[in-house]
């Protein structure tokens, strides 16, 4: 935050964890959502956000960083403006915290403008819709739940089923294939995952620190003196914003808005198609729950804040496409205890164009990505938007998988021999379809040892059509697992046949 000349001085009267009560002159009481600033000699200034007016001169604020070391009577300044973040081409390739301070070890970006993180959504007459499909290169997503350009996609799953890996693969695939600008907001997730993401983006060329830095990184170093700022600002296609799980609830509740503000800048002033990745929207809700409890509000269902729906709406309504450009968002949603009826994921559902449900059952079978094709949905899955071939192939895939699921109990009790020839054929093809829905990821190469695959939509449709038409019934099932195109499956199947 920049230090303004119109700041009003006050003093701290109470500190309770991340909550700070402050007193100001009667004619200088800050507004709700205004930023407060506390100077700290040994580190960066502490930024807080006003949440409540307690009386004539007192306000209650939530801190965006640790309040360790604060004392009653200590000076505090009202900035008379909301929290703001730097915007401009200079923020490409950079990492920021919730208040726009760089956390990548590099100097502050030299920008001419900052923008408040609290903004109104675009007016109704500025909005625009799209029937264009955004190709992701991930077979199961492109076929079963195509992503609309400018739409919102939710990735639902419990702990450890692959939400963050899927987000990282989407960043890698879409940034490379479409060369669009991306903004990533890490909300309440592991710091290690943030570090992994940064390294992955540099290795993939989505973030560019220059050739000298890349060479030092490949040799095991991390020499920031070798960063080429001109190349970073012109060639990098992503900006990262983090408010991780070790940070106070204020930071986790606002870092999504920080990332969204940057995405809105690229959309409105750059006239670009922007990708906005949010990992994890549940942590945003969880932070709001903590803040609500700290403010003394009465909880609602399952202990969530009474303002859950309106807070979610404030965030989601800003993620939209205008006549200037589009924001396509991918939001990871942690599902507590794998319960999709929990208020947090249930409230998120209402705002989404696509829902991608990750299945623990598929994960345990080793089918990755573990996306459930029967639970996942898309508003784009219609013949008018996709064309006849794509639509019919997707419906046939869902139909055969549904039939396989219906026969599971019979198979478990009586075995395959009791099925009719027609059902046996359906089961065999469904198992091949299920395995062909898997594919190796670029971001998981170091774990799987298999090179990642980007599969165009046309190849995806061709492959599934061949399986459904029975052209590949002679190939063993394991030939279909973790392959890219159908040609790779045929090649692997022929090799297996020769070995046998």
UniProtKB/Swiss-Prot annotation:
Q: Its domain of life?
A: Bacteria
Where in the cell is the protein located?
Cell inner membrane
Q: Which residues bind ATP?
A: 157-164
Q: Which InterPro entries match?
A: AAA+_ATPase, ATP-synt_VA_C, ATP_synth_F1_bsu, ATPase_a/bsu_AS, ATPase_alpha/beta_chains, ATPase_F1/V1/A1_a/bsu_N, ATPase_F1/V1/A1_a/bsu_N_sf, ATPase_F1/V1/A1_a/bsu_nucl-bd
Protein's UniProt keywords contain Ion transport: yes
Q: What GO cellular-component annotations does this UniProt entry give? A: plasma membrane; proton-transporting ATP synthase complex
What Enzyme Commission number(s) appear in the record? 7.1.2.2
Is Plastid included in the keywords of this UniProt record?
no
**Molecular functions per Gene Ontology:** ATP binding; ATP hydrolysis activity; proton-transporting ATP synthase activity, rotational mechanism
Entry keywords, A to Z: ATP synthesis, ATP-binding, Cell inner membrane, Cell membrane, CF(1), Hydrogen ion transport, Ion transport, Membrane, Nucleotide-binding, Translocase, Transport
Catalytic reaction list: ATP + H2O + 4 H(+)(in) = ADP + phosphate + 5 H(+)(out)
The UniProt entry lists the main location of this chain as membrane
What topology in the membrane does the UniProt record assign?
A: Peripheral membrane protein
Q: State the family it belongs to.
A: Belongs to the ATPase alpha/beta chains family.
Protein role: Produces ATP from ADP in the presence of a proton gradient across the membrane. The catalytic sites are hosted primarily by the beta subunits.
Extract the PANTHER family matched here: ATP SYNTHASE, ATP SYNTHASE SUBUNIT BETA, MITOCHONDRIAL
Quaternary state and interactors:
F-type ATPases have 2 components, CF(1) - the catalytic core - and CF(0) - the membrane proton channel. CF(1) has five subunits: alpha(3), beta(3), gamma(1), delta(1), epsilon(1). CF(0) has three main subunits: a(1), b(2) and c(9-12). The alpha and beta chains form an alternating ring which encloses part of the gamma chain. CF(1) is attached to CF(0) by a central stalk formed by the gamma and epsilon chains, while a peripheral stalk is formed by the delta and b chains.
What the entry lists under HAMAP family is as follows: ATP_synth_beta_bact
| UniProt protein name | ATP synthase subunit beta
- Organism of origin is Salinibacter ruber (strain DSM 13855 / M31)
């Amino acid at each position: 935050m920049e230090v303004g000349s119109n700041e009003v001085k006050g003093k701290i009267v109470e500190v309770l964890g991340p909550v700070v009560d402050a007193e100001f002159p009667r004619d200088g009481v800050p507004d709700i959502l205004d930023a407060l600033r506390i100077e700290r000699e040994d580190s960066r200034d502490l930024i807080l956000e006003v949440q409540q007016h307690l009386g004539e001169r007192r306000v209650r604020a939530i801190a965006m960083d640790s309040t360790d070391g604060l004392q009653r009577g200590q000076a505090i300044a009202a900035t008379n403006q909301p929290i703001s973040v730097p915007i401009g081409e200079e923020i490409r390739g950079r990492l920021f915290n919730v208040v726009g301070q760089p956390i990548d070890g590099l100097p502050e970006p030299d920008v001419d403008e900052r923008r408040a993180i609290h903004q109104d959504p675009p007016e109704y007459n500025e909005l625009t819709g799209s029937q264009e499909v955004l190709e992701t290169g991930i077979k199961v997503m492109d076929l079963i739940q195509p992503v609309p350009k400018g739409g919102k996609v939710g990735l639902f799953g419990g702990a450890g089923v692959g939400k963050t890996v899927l987000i990282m693969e989407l960043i890698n695939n879409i940034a490379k294939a479409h060369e669009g600008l991306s903004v990533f907001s890490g909300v309440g997730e592991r710091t290690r995952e943030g570090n992994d993401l940064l390294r992955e983006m540099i290795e993939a060329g989505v973030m560019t620190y220059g050739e000298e830095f890349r060479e030092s990184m490949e040799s095991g170093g991390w020499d920031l003196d070798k960063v080429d700022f001109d190349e970073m600002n012109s060639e990098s296609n992503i900006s990262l914003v983090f408010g991780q799980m070790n940070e106070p609830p204020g930071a986790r509740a606002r870092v999504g808005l920080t990332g969204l503000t940057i995405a809105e800048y690229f959309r409105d002033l750059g006239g670009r198609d922007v990708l906005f990745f949010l990992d994890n929207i549940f942590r945003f809700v969880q932070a709001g729950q903590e803040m609500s409890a700290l403010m003394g509000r009465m909880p609602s269902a399952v202990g969530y804040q009474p303002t859950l729906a309106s807070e979610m709406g404030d965030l989601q309504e800003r993620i939209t496409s205008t006549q200037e450009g589009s924001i396509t968002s991918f939001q990871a949603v942690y599902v507590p205890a794998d319960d999709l009826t929990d208020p947090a994921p249930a409230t998120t559902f209402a705002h989404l164009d696509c829902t991608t449900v990750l299945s623990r059952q598929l994960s345990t079978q080793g089918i990755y990505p573990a996306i459930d094709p029967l639970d996942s949905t898309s508003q784009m899955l219609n013949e008018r938007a996709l064309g006849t071939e794509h639509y019919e192939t997707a419906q046939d895939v869902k139909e055969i998988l549904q039939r396989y699921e219906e026969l599971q109990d019979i198979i478990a009790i009586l075995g395959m021999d009791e099925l009719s020839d027609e059902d046996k054929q359906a089961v065999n093809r469904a198992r091949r379809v299920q395995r062909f829905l898997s594919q190796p990821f670029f971001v998981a190469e170091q774990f799987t040892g298999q090179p990642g695959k980007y599969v165009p939509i046309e190849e995806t449709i061709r492959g599934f059509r061949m399986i459904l038409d029975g052209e590949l019934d002679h190939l063993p099932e394991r030939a279909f697992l973790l392959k890219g195109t159908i040609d790779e499956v045929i090649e692997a199947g022929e090799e297996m046949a020769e070995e046998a």
